[in-house]
Protein backbone atom coordinates (compact mmCIF):
# COMPACT_ATOMS: atom_id res chain seq x y z
CA UNK A 1 0.00 0.00 0.00
CA UNK A 2 1.30 3.45 -0.91
CA UNK A 3 2.12 6.13 1.64
CA UNK A 4 -0.95 8.23 0.79
CA UNK A 5 -3.23 5.18 0.78
CA UNK A 6 -1.95 4.26 4.24
CA UNK A 7 -2.55 7.80 5.49
CA UNK A 8 -6.10 7.69 4.15
CA UNK A 9 -6.82 4.33 5.72
CA UNK A 10 -5.63 5.58 9.08
CA UNK A 11 -7.64 8.82 8.80
CA UNK A 12 -10.84 7.00 7.78
CA UNK A 13 -10.41 4.67 10.74
CA UNK A 14 -10.11 7.61 13.13
CA UNK A 15 -13.20 9.26 11.65
CA UNK A 16 -15.16 6.00 11.88
CA UNK A 17 -14.31 5.76 15.58
CA UNK A 18 -15.35 9.40 16.10
CA UNK A 19 -18.70 8.84 14.33
CA UNK A 20 -19.44 5.74 16.42
CA UNK A 21 -18.66 7.57 19.65
CA UNK A 22 -20.35 10.87 18.80
CA UNK A 23 -23.40 10.41 16.54
CA UNK A 24 -26.13 8.12 17.79
CA UNK A 25 -27.71 5.88 15.15
CA UNK A 26 -25.08 6.55 12.48
CA UNK A 27 -24.63 3.96 9.71
CA UNK A 28 -21.78 3.29 7.28
CA UNK A 29 -22.83 3.83 3.66
CA UNK A 30 -22.50 0.78 1.41
CA UNK A 31 -21.33 1.06 -2.23
CA UNK A 32 -24.90 1.16 -3.56
CA UNK A 33 -25.80 4.12 -1.36
CA UNK A 34 -22.58 5.89 -2.31
CA UNK A 35 -23.43 5.46 -6.01
CA UNK A 36 -26.91 6.87 -5.36
CA UNK A 37 -25.19 9.96 -3.99
CA UNK A 38 -23.04 10.26 -7.11
CA UNK A 39 -19.90 8.72 -5.58
CA UNK A 40 -18.03 5.51 -6.27
CA UNK A 41 -16.36 2.85 -4.14
CA UNK A 42 -13.25 4.97 -3.67
CA UNK A 43 -15.27 7.17 -1.29
CA UNK A 44 -16.28 6.45 2.30
CA UNK A 45 -19.40 7.76 3.97
CA UNK A 46 -21.85 7.62 6.85
CA UNK A 47 -25.51 8.43 7.36
CA UNK A 48 -25.82 10.75 10.34
CA UNK A 49 -29.43 11.11 11.60
CA UNK A 50 -30.61 14.67 12.20
CA UNK A 51 -32.30 15.38 15.48
CA UNK A 52 -35.49 17.39 15.73
CA UNK A 53 -39.07 17.16 14.61
CA UNK A 54 -38.25 17.45 10.91
CA UNK A 55 -35.86 14.50 10.96
CA UNK A 56 -33.84 13.64 7.90
CA UNK A 57 -30.23 12.63 7.50
CA UNK A 58 -26.87 14.21 6.90
CA UNK A 59 -24.43 12.19 4.81
CA UNK A 60 -20.76 12.54 5.70
CA UNK A 61 -18.58 11.81 2.66
CA UNK A 62 -14.79 11.41 2.43
CA UNK A 63 -13.20 11.48 -1.03
CA UNK A 64 -10.12 9.48 -2.15
CA UNK A 65 -7.77 12.36 -1.24
CA UNK A 66 -8.83 12.56 2.42
CA UNK A 67 -7.27 13.67 4.83
CA UNK A 68 -5.68 16.05 2.30
CA UNK A 69 -9.13 17.31 1.34
CA UNK A 70 -12.19 18.55 3.18
CA UNK A 71 -15.10 16.30 4.15
CA UNK A 72 -18.35 16.75 2.20
CA UNK A 73 -21.89 16.73 3.53
CA UNK A 74 -25.19 16.10 1.75
CA UNK A 75 -28.78 16.20 2.96
CA UNK A 76 -31.01 13.14 2.89
CA UNK A 77 -34.80 12.97 3.30
CA UNK A 78 -35.09 16.75 3.54
CA UNK A 79 -36.82 17.81 0.34
CA UNK A 80 -37.93 21.02 2.07
CA UNK A 81 -34.33 22.27 2.05
CA UNK A 82 -33.21 21.22 -1.43
CA UNK A 83 -33.68 24.79 -2.73
CA UNK A 84 -32.41 26.50 0.41
CA UNK A 85 -29.33 28.75 0.37
CA UNK A 86 -26.01 26.91 0.13
CA UNK A 87 -27.69 23.61 -0.78
CA UNK A 88 -26.52 22.34 -4.16
CA UNK A 89 -27.48 19.49 -6.49
CA UNK A 90 -28.47 16.26 -4.71
CA UNK A 91 -28.53 18.07 -1.38
CA UNK A 92 -24.81 18.79 -1.22
CA UNK A 93 -23.99 21.50 1.31
CA UNK A 94 -21.65 24.33 0.35
CA UNK A 95 -19.58 24.99 3.46
CA UNK A 96 -15.95 26.01 2.93
CA UNK A 97 -16.20 26.53 -0.83
CA UNK A 98 -13.51 25.77 -3.38
CA UNK A 99 -10.00 26.12 -2.04
CA UNK A 100 -10.91 25.64 1.62
CA UNK A 101 -7.92 24.58 3.72
CA UNK A 102 -7.81 21.95 6.44
CA UNK A 103 -5.48 20.73 9.16
CA UNK A 104 -4.30 17.66 7.29
CA UNK A 105 -2.68 16.25 10.43
CA UNK A 106 -5.90 16.17 12.49
CA UNK A 107 -8.69 14.65 10.35
CA UNK A 108 -11.05 14.08 13.27
CA UNK A 109 -10.94 17.75 14.31
CA UNK A 110 -11.63 18.78 10.71
CA UNK A 111 -14.63 16.45 10.43
CA UNK A 112 -15.99 17.51 13.82
CA UNK A 113 -15.72 21.19 12.95
CA UNK A 114 -17.27 20.71 9.51
CA UNK A 115 -20.11 18.68 11.04
CA UNK A 116 -20.86 21.57 13.37
CA UNK A 117 -20.83 23.99 10.42
CA UNK A 118 -23.25 21.75 8.52
CA UNK A 119 -25.66 21.59 11.46
CA UNK A 120 -25.49 25.37 11.87
CA UNK A 121 -26.26 25.90 8.17
CA UNK A 122 -29.25 23.57 8.35
CA UNK A 123 -30.60 25.41 11.39
CA UNK A 124 -30.19 28.78 9.65
CA UNK A 125 -31.90 27.53 6.50
CA UNK A 126 -34.77 26.13 8.56
CA UNK A 127 -35.18 29.55 10.19
CA UNK A 128 -35.00 31.39 6.85
CA UNK A 129 -31.94 33.33 8.01
CA UNK A 130 -29.85 33.03 4.83
CA UNK A 131 -32.17 34.34 2.13
CA UNK A 132 -30.03 37.39 1.40
CA UNK A 133 -27.35 34.97 0.20
CA UNK A 134 -29.48 34.26 -2.88
CA UNK A 135 -28.63 37.74 -4.14
CA UNK A 136 -24.96 37.57 -3.13
CA UNK A 137 -24.40 34.44 -5.25
CA UNK A 138 -27.26 34.95 -7.69
CA UNK A 139 -25.61 33.59 -10.83
CA UNK A 140 -24.64 30.36 -9.05
CA UNK A 141 -28.22 29.71 -7.90
CA UNK A 142 -29.54 30.49 -11.37
CA UNK A 143 -27.07 28.05 -12.94
CA UNK A 144 -28.28 25.39 -10.54
CA UNK A 145 -31.82 25.76 -11.93
CA UNK A 146 -31.19 25.90 -15.68
CA UNK A 147 -33.80 24.13 -17.79
CA UNK A 148 -32.05 24.21 -21.18
CA UNK A 149 -28.41 23.22 -21.82
CA UNK A 150 -27.83 25.81 -24.56
CA UNK A 151 -25.68 28.59 -23.03
CA UNK A 152 -25.67 32.30 -23.78
CA UNK A 153 -22.20 33.73 -24.25
CA UNK A 154 -22.20 37.45 -23.63
CA UNK A 155 -19.96 40.47 -24.11
CA UNK A 156 -22.01 43.33 -22.66
CA UNK A 157 -21.41 46.63 -20.91
CA UNK A 158 -22.35 46.75 -17.23
CA UNK A 159 -24.73 49.67 -17.75
CA UNK A 160 -27.67 50.00 -15.38
CA UNK A 161 -30.32 50.32 -18.05
CA UNK A 162 -32.50 47.97 -20.06
CA UNK A 163 -32.04 47.89 -23.83
CA UNK A 164 -32.26 45.84 -26.98
CA UNK A 165 -28.98 44.16 -27.91
CA UNK A 166 -27.82 41.88 -30.71
CA UNK A 167 -27.71 38.08 -30.77
CA UNK A 168 -26.23 35.45 -33.03
CA UNK A 169 -28.03 32.10 -32.80
CA UNK A 170 -25.57 29.25 -33.16
CA UNK A 171 -26.11 25.53 -32.71
CA UNK A 172 -23.82 25.17 -29.69
CA UNK A 173 -24.44 28.59 -28.10
CA UNK A 174 -25.98 32.02 -28.64
CA UNK A 175 -23.67 35.02 -28.61
CA UNK A 176 -24.99 38.33 -27.25
CA UNK A 177 -23.24 41.69 -27.71
CA UNK A 178 -24.23 45.34 -27.57
CA UNK A 179 -24.73 45.55 -31.33
CA UNK A 180 -24.26 43.53 -34.51
CA UNK A 181 -20.89 45.14 -35.24
CA UNK A 182 -19.44 44.11 -31.88
CA UNK A 183 -20.92 40.62 -32.20
CA UNK A 184 -19.52 40.17 -35.70
CA UNK A 185 -16.06 41.41 -34.65
CA UNK A 186 -15.90 39.00 -31.70
CA UNK A 187 -17.12 36.02 -33.72
CA UNK A 188 -14.77 36.80 -36.60
CA UNK A 189 -11.81 37.11 -34.25
CA UNK A 190 -12.69 33.86 -32.52
CA UNK A 191 -13.90 31.67 -35.39
CA UNK A 192 -12.93 33.42 -38.61
CA UNK A 193 -14.88 35.25 -41.29
CA UNK A 194 -18.37 33.97 -42.13
CA UNK A 195 -20.47 36.30 -44.27
CA UNK A 196 -23.61 34.20 -43.66
CA UNK A 197 -23.84 35.10 -39.98
CA UNK A 198 -27.14 36.84 -39.22
CA UNK A 199 -28.07 38.74 -36.07
CA UNK A 200 -31.35 39.11 -34.24
CA UNK A 201 -32.66 41.28 -31.46
CA UNK A 202 -32.26 40.19 -27.86
CA UNK A 203 -33.24 41.97 -24.65
CA UNK A 204 -30.98 43.03 -21.82
CA UNK A 205 -33.07 43.75 -18.72
CA UNK A 206 -31.53 45.50 -15.75
CA UNK A 207 -33.10 44.21 -12.53
CA UNK A 208 -33.11 46.64 -9.61
CA UNK A 209 -33.75 43.71 -7.30
CA UNK A 210 -32.47 40.20 -7.99
CA UNK A 211 -35.10 37.47 -7.57
CA UNK A 212 -34.98 34.51 -5.22
CA UNK A 213 -35.31 31.01 -6.71
CA UNK A 214 -39.07 30.76 -6.26
CA UNK A 215 -39.36 33.83 -8.51
CA UNK A 216 -37.21 32.40 -11.30
CA UNK A 217 -39.48 32.42 -14.37
CA UNK A 218 -40.46 29.16 -16.02
CA UNK A 219 -42.50 30.81 -18.79
CA UNK A 220 -42.49 34.13 -20.60
CA UNK A 221 -45.53 35.36 -18.70
CA UNK A 222 -43.78 34.98 -15.36
CA UNK A 223 -40.69 36.61 -16.84
CA UNK A 224 -42.82 39.61 -17.79
CA UNK A 225 -44.25 39.85 -14.27
CA UNK A 226 -40.74 39.67 -12.80
CA UNK A 227 -39.61 42.51 -15.05
CA UNK A 228 -42.67 44.58 -14.21
CA UNK A 229 -41.97 44.20 -10.49
CA UNK A 230 -38.18 44.47 -10.47
CA UNK A 231 -37.01 46.58 -13.42
CA UNK A 232 -37.31 50.30 -14.01
CA UNK A 233 -38.21 50.79 -17.68
CA UNK A 234 -37.39 47.19 -18.51
CA UNK A 235 -40.94 46.28 -19.47
CA UNK A 236 -41.07 48.34 -22.71
CA UNK A 237 -37.87 46.66 -23.88
CA UNK A 238 -39.22 43.17 -23.15
CA UNK A 239 -42.58 43.98 -24.75
CA UNK A 240 -40.87 45.23 -27.89
CA UNK A 241 -38.97 41.95 -28.13
CA UNK A 242 -42.23 40.01 -27.68
CA UNK A 243 -43.84 42.00 -30.49
CA UNK A 244 -40.98 41.63 -32.98
CA UNK A 245 -39.38 38.24 -32.29
CA UNK A 246 -39.89 35.25 -34.55
CA UNK A 247 -39.49 31.72 -33.24
CA UNK A 248 -36.92 32.19 -30.48
CA UNK A 249 -35.22 35.07 -28.68
CA UNK A 250 -32.73 35.54 -25.87
CA UNK A 251 -33.17 37.63 -22.74
CA UNK A 252 -30.27 38.53 -20.46
CA UNK A 253 -31.06 39.61 -16.92
CA UNK A 254 -28.42 41.83 -15.35
CA UNK A 255 -28.24 43.22 -11.83
CA UNK A 256 -25.97 44.02 -8.91
CA UNK A 257 -25.43 41.79 -5.89
CA UNK A 258 -25.32 43.07 -2.33
CA UNK A 259 -21.53 43.31 -2.69
CA UNK A 260 -21.81 45.42 -5.86
CA UNK A 261 -20.77 42.74 -8.34
CA UNK A 262 -22.71 42.80 -11.61
CA UNK A 263 -24.17 39.39 -12.49
CA UNK A 264 -26.05 37.98 -15.46
CA UNK A 265 -28.65 35.27 -16.01
CA UNK A 266 -30.15 33.99 -19.24
CA UNK A 267 -33.58 33.14 -20.57
CA UNK A 268 -34.65 31.70 -23.92
CA UNK A 269 -38.17 32.60 -25.02
CA UNK A 270 -39.84 30.58 -27.75
CA UNK A 271 -43.24 30.01 -29.32
CA UNK A 272 -45.58 27.10 -28.57
CA UNK A 273 -44.76 23.57 -29.65
CA UNK A 274 -45.37 22.49 -33.19
CA UNK A 275 -48.73 20.75 -33.49
CA UNK A 276 -48.37 16.99 -33.23
CA UNK A 277 -50.74 16.21 -36.13
CA UNK A 278 -47.92 15.81 -38.64
CA UNK A 279 -44.84 17.44 -40.04
CA UNK A 280 -46.92 19.73 -42.28
CA UNK A 281 -49.12 21.03 -39.50
CA UNK A 282 -48.86 24.80 -39.00
CA UNK A 283 -47.23 26.23 -35.94
CA UNK A 284 -49.73 27.72 -33.46
CA UNK A 285 -50.04 31.47 -33.98
CA UNK A 286 -49.23 33.40 -30.82
CA UNK A 287 -51.26 36.34 -32.20
CA UNK A 288 -54.44 34.38 -32.89
CA UNK A 289 -57.58 36.35 -32.12
CA UNK A 290 -55.89 39.68 -32.85
CA UNK A 291 -55.15 41.62 -36.00
CA UNK A 292 -51.51 41.48 -37.10
CA UNK A 293 -49.39 43.67 -34.85
CA UNK A 294 -52.24 44.32 -32.38
CA UNK A 295 -51.75 41.46 -29.92
CA UNK A 296 -50.98 42.86 -26.43
CA UNK A 297 -47.44 42.04 -25.24
CA UNK A 298 -48.89 40.43 -22.12
CA UNK A 299 -50.80 37.95 -24.30
CA UNK A 300 -47.76 37.28 -26.48
CA UNK A 301 -45.72 36.52 -23.37
CA UNK A 302 -48.38 34.24 -21.87
CA UNK A 303 -48.49 32.20 -25.07
CA UNK A 304 -44.74 31.65 -25.14
CA UNK A 305 -42.54 29.32 -23.17
CA UNK A 306 -39.19 30.16 -21.64
CA UNK A 307 -36.17 28.20 -20.49
CA UNK A 308 -33.60 29.28 -17.94
CA UNK A 309 -30.09 28.99 -19.38
CA UNK A 310 -26.55 29.53 -18.19
CA UNK A 311 -24.71 32.71 -19.10
CA UNK A 312 -21.04 32.33 -19.98
CA UNK A 313 -19.49 35.77 -19.84
CA UNK A 314 -16.71 36.11 -22.38
CA UNK A 315 -15.48 39.12 -20.40
CA UNK A 316 -15.40 37.22 -17.11
CA UNK A 317 -11.61 37.58 -17.06
CA UNK A 318 -12.11 41.28 -16.30
CA UNK A 319 -13.34 40.25 -12.86
CA UNK A 320 -9.83 39.01 -12.07
CA UNK A 321 -8.36 42.47 -12.68
CA UNK A 322 -8.30 45.55 -10.52
CA UNK A 323 -11.62 47.37 -10.72
CA UNK A 324 -12.04 49.36 -13.90
CA UNK A 325 -8.65 48.63 -15.45
CA UNK A 326 -9.92 46.37 -18.20
CA UNK A 327 -12.61 48.82 -19.31
CA UNK A 328 -10.08 51.67 -19.48
CA UNK A 329 -7.54 49.62 -21.43
CA UNK A 330 -10.22 48.46 -23.88
CA UNK A 331 -10.31 51.96 -25.31
CA UNK A 332 -6.54 52.31 -25.69
CA UNK A 333 -4.59 52.01 -28.93
CA UNK A 334 -0.96 50.87 -28.92
CA UNK A 335 1.62 50.08 -31.57
CA UNK A 336 4.33 47.48 -30.97
CA UNK A 337 7.44 48.06 -33.09
CA UNK A 338 9.43 44.84 -33.15
CA UNK A 339 7.74 41.45 -32.71
CA UNK A 340 10.71 39.36 -31.67
CA UNK A 341 11.00 37.30 -28.51
CA UNK A 342 10.57 40.43 -26.39
CA UNK A 343 7.89 42.22 -28.41
CA UNK A 344 5.70 39.17 -29.03
CA UNK A 345 5.48 38.38 -25.33
CA UNK A 346 4.80 41.99 -24.35
CA UNK A 347 2.03 42.22 -26.96
CA UNK A 348 0.42 39.10 -25.52
CA UNK A 349 0.53 40.47 -21.97
CA UNK A 350 -1.08 43.73 -23.08
CA UNK A 351 -3.88 41.88 -24.87
CA UNK A 352 -4.42 39.70 -21.82
CA UNK A 353 -4.68 42.87 -19.76
CA UNK A 354 -7.46 44.22 -21.96
CA UNK A 355 -5.83 46.57 -24.49
CA UNK A 356 -8.48 46.89 -27.18
CA UNK A 357 -6.57 48.14 -30.22
CA UNK A 358 -3.11 47.07 -31.28
CA UNK A 359 -0.91 47.23 -34.36
CA UNK A 360 2.09 44.90 -34.61
CA UNK A 361 4.90 46.11 -36.86
CA UNK A 362 7.85 43.96 -37.98
CA UNK A 363 9.39 43.21 -41.39
CA UNK A 364 11.19 40.01 -40.38
CA UNK A 365 10.31 36.33 -40.69
CA UNK A 366 10.24 33.92 -37.79
CA UNK A 367 13.22 31.54 -37.69
CA UNK A 368 13.84 28.17 -36.09
CA UNK A 369 16.50 29.62 -33.80
CA UNK A 370 13.81 31.47 -31.80
CA UNK A 371 11.31 28.62 -31.36
CA UNK A 372 12.33 28.14 -27.72
CA UNK A 373 11.76 31.72 -26.61
CA UNK A 374 9.01 33.24 -28.76
CA UNK A 375 5.21 33.33 -28.62
CA UNK A 376 5.28 31.67 -32.04
CA UNK A 377 6.24 28.04 -32.51
CA UNK A 378 7.56 25.77 -35.21
CA UNK A 379 4.30 26.01 -37.16
CA UNK A 380 5.11 29.67 -37.88
CA UNK A 381 8.68 29.40 -39.17
CA UNK A 382 9.42 31.30 -42.38
CA UNK A 383 6.34 33.48 -41.82
CA UNK A 384 6.28 37.19 -41.07
CA UNK A 385 6.29 37.60 -37.30
CA UNK A 386 3.71 40.38 -37.09
CA UNK A 387 1.24 38.59 -39.36
CA UNK A 388 1.66 35.24 -37.62
CA UNK A 389 1.21 36.80 -34.17
CA UNK A 390 -1.99 38.57 -35.18
CA UNK A 391 -3.41 35.35 -36.60
CA UNK A 392 -2.53 33.57 -33.36
CA UNK A 393 -3.79 36.29 -31.02
CA UNK A 394 -7.16 36.96 -32.68
CA UNK A 395 -8.90 33.72 -31.64
CA UNK A 396 -7.12 33.78 -28.27
CA UNK A 397 -8.30 37.31 -27.39
CA UNK A 398 -11.46 37.99 -29.43
CA UNK A 399 -12.28 40.96 -27.18
CA UNK A 400 -9.66 43.02 -29.05
CA UNK A 401 -11.64 45.42 -31.20
CA UNK A 402 -8.80 45.98 -33.64
CA UNK A 403 -5.70 43.84 -34.10
CA UNK A 404 -3.62 44.58 -37.20
CA UNK A 405 -0.30 43.43 -38.61
CA UNK A 406 2.08 45.58 -40.62
CA UNK A 407 4.72 43.25 -42.13
CA UNK A 408 7.18 46.06 -42.71
CA UNK A 409 9.44 48.43 -40.80
CA UNK A 410 7.99 51.45 -39.05
CA UNK A 411 10.01 53.69 -41.36
CA UNK A 412 8.44 52.19 -44.49
CA UNK A 413 5.02 52.33 -42.84
CA UNK A 414 5.33 56.05 -42.12
CA UNK A 415 6.55 56.78 -45.63
CA UNK A 416 3.45 55.06 -46.92
CA UNK A 417 1.11 56.60 -44.33
CA UNK A 418 2.57 59.47 -42.25
CA UNK A 419 -0.39 59.25 -39.84
CA UNK A 420 -0.13 55.52 -39.19
CA UNK A 421 0.96 56.12 -35.57
CA UNK A 422 -0.92 59.38 -35.17
CA UNK A 423 -3.74 58.11 -32.92
CA UNK A 424 -1.71 55.80 -30.70
CA UNK A 425 -1.96 56.24 -26.95
CA UNK A 426 1.44 54.56 -26.58
CA UNK A 427 4.18 53.33 -28.92
CA UNK A 428 6.39 50.47 -27.77
CA UNK A 429 9.75 50.22 -29.49
CA UNK A 430 11.19 46.76 -28.81
CA UNK A 431 13.42 46.58 -31.85
CA UNK A 432 16.77 46.49 -30.08
CA UNK A 433 18.42 48.40 -32.94
CA UNK A 434 20.12 51.71 -32.15
CA UNK A 435 19.90 53.10 -35.67
CA UNK A 436 16.14 52.58 -35.91
CA UNK A 437 15.40 53.69 -32.36
CA UNK A 438 17.53 56.80 -32.46
CA UNK A 439 15.62 57.76 -35.61
CA UNK A 440 12.33 57.21 -33.78
CA UNK A 441 13.57 59.31 -30.87
CA UNK A 442 14.57 62.17 -33.18
CA UNK A 443 11.25 61.97 -35.02
CA UNK A 444 9.37 62.32 -31.74
CA UNK A 445 11.38 65.46 -30.93
CA UNK A 446 11.27 66.89 -34.45
CA UNK A 447 8.16 69.00 -34.08
CA UNK A 448 6.29 67.10 -36.81
CA UNK A 449 2.92 65.45 -36.31
CA UNK A 450 3.93 61.86 -37.07
CA UNK A 451 4.66 60.70 -33.49
CA UNK A 452 2.50 62.30 -30.82
CA UNK A 453 2.40 59.60 -28.14
CA UNK A 454 4.94 58.65 -25.51
CA UNK A 455 7.41 55.99 -26.64
CA UNK A 456 8.27 53.06 -24.38
CA UNK A 457 11.65 51.57 -25.29
CA UNK A 458 12.55 48.12 -24.02
CA UNK A 459 15.79 46.19 -24.35
CA UNK A 460 17.88 43.43 -22.83
CA UNK A 461 21.49 43.51 -21.81
CA UNK A 462 23.73 40.63 -22.83
CA UNK A 463 22.42 37.17 -21.88
CA UNK A 464 19.33 38.85 -20.34
CA UNK A 465 21.42 39.78 -17.31
CA UNK A 466 19.31 42.94 -17.06
CA UNK A 467 16.31 44.41 -18.82
CA UNK A 468 15.26 48.03 -19.18
CA UNK A 469 11.94 49.78 -19.81
CA UNK A 470 12.29 53.47 -20.62
CA UNK A 471 9.38 55.81 -21.37
CA UNK A 472 10.17 59.01 -23.23
CA UNK A 473 7.75 61.86 -23.87
CA UNK A 474 7.88 64.92 -26.14
CA UNK A 475 9.73 66.93 -23.47
CA UNK A 476 12.37 66.22 -20.86
CA UNK A 477 15.14 63.68 -21.23
CA UNK A 478 15.20 61.77 -24.51
CA UNK A 479 16.55 58.36 -25.47
CA UNK A 480 19.90 59.82 -26.53
CA UNK A 481 20.45 61.38 -23.09
CA UNK A 482 21.49 58.01 -21.69
CA UNK A 483 23.49 56.70 -24.64
CA UNK A 484 26.65 57.50 -26.51
CA UNK A 485 26.55 58.48 -30.19
CA UNK A 486 26.71 54.86 -31.38
CA UNK A 487 24.21 53.45 -28.90
CA UNK A 488 26.42 52.43 -25.97
CA UNK A 489 24.53 52.98 -22.74
CA UNK A 490 26.26 55.29 -20.25
CA UNK A 491 25.39 53.23 -17.15
CA UNK A 492 24.95 49.52 -17.94
CA UNK A 493 23.88 47.16 -15.19
CA UNK A 494 26.11 44.26 -16.21
CA UNK A 495 29.48 43.60 -17.81
CA UNK A 496 30.56 40.46 -19.67
CA UNK A 497 34.28 39.76 -20.13
CA UNK A 498 33.39 36.89 -22.46
CA UNK A 499 31.18 38.17 -25.28
CA UNK A 500 29.11 36.11 -27.67
CA UNK A 501 30.56 35.81 -31.18
CA UNK A 502 29.61 38.50 -33.68
CA UNK A 503 28.81 37.39 -37.21
CA UNK A 504 27.58 39.15 -40.32
CA UNK A 505 24.06 39.12 -38.89
CA UNK A 506 25.10 40.74 -35.62
CA UNK A 507 25.88 39.29 -32.19
CA UNK A 508 24.28 36.07 -31.01
CA UNK A 509 21.85 36.63 -28.13
CA UNK A 510 22.09 33.93 -25.48
CA UNK A 511 18.99 33.64 -23.29
CA UNK A 512 15.92 31.47 -22.97
CA UNK A 513 12.22 31.86 -22.28
CA UNK A 514 12.68 31.80 -18.50
CA UNK A 515 15.27 34.60 -18.66
CA UNK A 516 12.95 36.57 -20.93
CA UNK A 517 9.76 36.40 -18.85
CA UNK A 518 10.74 39.05 -16.23
CA UNK A 519 11.71 41.47 -19.00
CA UNK A 520 8.37 41.04 -20.74
CA UNK A 521 6.53 41.62 -17.47
CA UNK A 522 8.67 44.68 -16.70
CA UNK A 523 7.85 46.37 -20.00
CA UNK A 524 4.17 45.42 -20.08
CA UNK A 525 3.70 46.61 -16.51
CA UNK A 526 5.15 50.04 -17.27
CA UNK A 527 3.06 50.22 -20.45
CA UNK A 528 -0.12 49.66 -18.44
CA UNK A 529 0.91 52.25 -15.86
CA UNK A 530 1.47 54.77 -18.65
CA UNK A 531 -1.84 53.98 -20.35
CA UNK A 532 -3.76 54.30 -17.07
CA UNK A 533 -2.02 57.50 -16.03
CA UNK A 534 -0.19 55.94 -13.10
CA UNK A 535 3.20 56.90 -14.52
CA UNK A 536 4.48 59.60 -16.85
CA UNK A 537 7.68 59.99 -18.88
CA UNK A 538 10.55 60.20 -18.55
CA UNK A 539 10.67 57.09 -16.39
CA UNK A 540 13.00 54.09 -16.38
CA UNK A 541 12.58 50.75 -14.65
CA UNK A 542 15.09 47.93 -14.73
CA UNK A 543 15.05 44.23 -13.96
CA UNK A 544 18.28 42.78 -12.57
CA UNK A 545 18.56 39.05 -13.06
CA UNK A 546 19.57 36.73 -10.19
CA UNK A 547 23.32 36.81 -9.68
CA UNK A 548 23.73 33.09 -10.56
CA UNK A 549 22.38 33.91 -14.05
CA UNK A 550 25.26 36.34 -14.51
CA UNK A 551 27.83 34.02 -12.99
CA UNK A 552 26.84 31.18 -15.30
CA UNK A 553 27.80 33.26 -18.33
CA UNK A 554 30.81 34.92 -16.73
CA UNK A 555 29.06 38.25 -16.12
CA UNK A 556 29.00 40.55 -13.09
CA UNK A 557 27.49 43.84 -11.99
CA UNK A 558 28.99 46.85 -13.73
CA UNK A 559 31.01 49.22 -11.55
CA UNK A 560 29.24 52.24 -13.00
CA UNK A 561 25.85 50.82 -11.98
CA UNK A 562 27.14 50.16 -8.48
CA UNK A 563 28.50 53.72 -8.28
CA UNK A 564 25.22 55.29 -9.38
CA UNK A 565 22.56 52.99 -7.91
CA UNK A 566 24.26 50.71 -5.39
CA UNK A 567 25.35 47.08 -5.44
CA UNK A 568 22.52 44.75 -6.60
CA UNK A 569 24.18 41.96 -4.55
CA UNK A 570 22.24 38.77 -5.38
CA UNK A 571 20.05 40.49 -7.98
CA UNK A 572 16.61 39.14 -8.76
CA UNK A 573 15.00 42.53 -8.24
CA UNK A 574 13.05 45.27 -9.96
CA UNK A 575 14.28 48.81 -9.52
CA UNK A 576 13.32 52.30 -10.68
CA UNK A 577 16.27 54.52 -11.55
CA UNK A 578 16.54 58.09 -12.88
CA UNK A 579 17.01 58.93 -16.55
CA UNK A 580 18.52 62.43 -16.28
CA UNK A 581 18.54 64.93 -19.11
CA UNK A 582 21.98 65.41 -20.65
CA UNK A 583 22.68 69.10 -21.22
CA UNK A 584 25.04 68.19 -24.05
CA UNK A 585 22.50 65.95 -25.79
CA UNK A 586 21.35 66.93 -29.27
CA UNK A 587 17.72 66.92 -28.07
CA UNK A 588 18.38 70.35 -26.57
CA UNK A 589 18.87 71.66 -30.10
CA UNK A 590 15.80 70.03 -31.67
CA UNK A 591 12.47 71.87 -31.90
CA UNK A 592 9.76 70.50 -29.64
CA UNK A 593 6.05 70.75 -30.30
CA UNK A 594 3.39 69.73 -27.80
CA UNK A 595 0.31 68.28 -29.46
CA UNK A 596 -3.07 68.54 -27.81
Describe the residue ranges of each PLM region.
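Domain-level detector for trafficking modules
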Residues: 87-98, 103-144
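N-terminal charged helix/coil linker that caps or initiates catalytic domains
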Residues: 273-334
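Compact alpha/beta protein-protein interaction domains typified by the UBC
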Residues: 34-99, 108-112
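Glycine-rich phosphate/adenylate-binding loop
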Residues: 143-297, 422-426, 430-596
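Glycine-rich phosphate-binding loop and adjoining beta1-alpha1-beta2 segment
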Residues: 363-399
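Strand-helix-loop interaction patch of compact alpha/beta domains
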Residues: 1-57
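Glycine-rich adenosine-cofactor-binding loop
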Residues: 322-365
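A structured beta-alpha segment of the ubiquitous adenosine-cofactor-binding alpha/beta core
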Residues: 389-425, 431-434
